[in-house]
Amino acid sequence: MTESNIKKVALVGGGVIGGGWATRCLANGLEVVLTDPRPEARDYVETMVADAWPVLEDAGLLSENKGQLHFAQDIAEAVQDADFVQENVPEREELKISVHEEISQHAREDVVIASSSSGLLPSRLQARCAYPERLMIGHPFAPVYLLLSLIHISEPTRPY
């Protein structure tokens, strides 16, 4: 097993799925930067992490080092230094397309961008991305912090 180059994860959306991703990433010792326009998102995510932590501990799924959780004011701030971006906004096509457009404008051009979409075509989400080949579907099973995810690579892609 090799060490991952991913140290900092940006999460766009802090609802059930985003909070679950935050918990999973923190349990694996990653730095997490989360953005969500809803004022209650911060408390929601912090509560989710606190509630899930004993479950992860009992299951032996915590790394030696707990990651750090930070909150950003907007997408640009959240993704600017991220090594991986996971989008978790509501399942509305135009919203997701717009969010992916903004992410692609501010994330490094070598960063993979995943969407938690459960039913939208990746090719549609790529429509306005600066680097459409970076986008993939990374849809989690519930609870996100315990179960593996379904990954779907979209077209076109480019090797890294």
Model-derived regions: residue spans:
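Short glycine/serine/threonine-rich phosphate/pyrophosphate-binding segments
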Residues: 18-21, 94, 118-122
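Hydrophobic/aromatic beta-strand patches that form the interior of the parallel beta-sheet core
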Residues: 33, 86, 136-138
